[in-house]
């Protein structure tokens, strides 16, 4: 169940409402972003489960989980991988947060994270590693594009109130 909600044309800016969506989680449940109003949300987009950079990014967040909980933050990771693959990834690395499947990349498009990439001279569409910190009212408080997995957790903590 991938419902990106109203289309925003890929325009997202700090201070504006975060595009709402409903995606399927690693446990098979439908998760809607707006259901977390009242708490800050760390919404991070990543290319693929169980790859070096994505694993470092996820484990970095896991390693500061206690601090994120103290700040009352909800963490949602989003990639094009399916719920089963997410469940295996989450279990393998003991990730305490929810992973969401955006298999048709509609939500990534609404957040402008589904972008043109290139590798070895080939051009293709793929997920840009990006994070959005959404405040308790549902507005985008901070946008981090092309994040570095090694520094990501510290940057997320610094962006939270």
Identify the role of each PLM range.
Residues 1-161:
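Chalcogenol-based redox active-site neighborhoods
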């Amino acid at each position: 169940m991938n419902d990106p909600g109203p289309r925003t044309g890929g325009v997202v800016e700090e201070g504006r409402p975060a595009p709402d969506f409903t995606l399927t989680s690693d446990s098979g449940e439908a998760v809607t972003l707006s259901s977390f109003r009242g708490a800050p949300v760390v919404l991070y987009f990543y290319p693929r489960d169980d790859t070096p950079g994505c694993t470092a990014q996820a484990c970095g967040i896991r390693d500061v989980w206690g601090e994120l909980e103290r700040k009352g933050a909800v963490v949602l990771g989003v990639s094009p991988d399916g719920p089963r693959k997410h469940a295996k990834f989450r279990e393998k690395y003991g990730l305490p947060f929810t992973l969401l499947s955006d298999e048709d990349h509609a939500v990534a498009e609404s957040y402008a994270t589904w972008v043109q990439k290139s590798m070895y001279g080939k051009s293709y569409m793929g997920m840009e590693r990006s994070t959005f910190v959404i405040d308790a009212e549902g507005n985008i408080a901070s946008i981090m594009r092309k994040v570095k997995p090694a520094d990501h957790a510290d940057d997320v903590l610094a962006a939270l109130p």
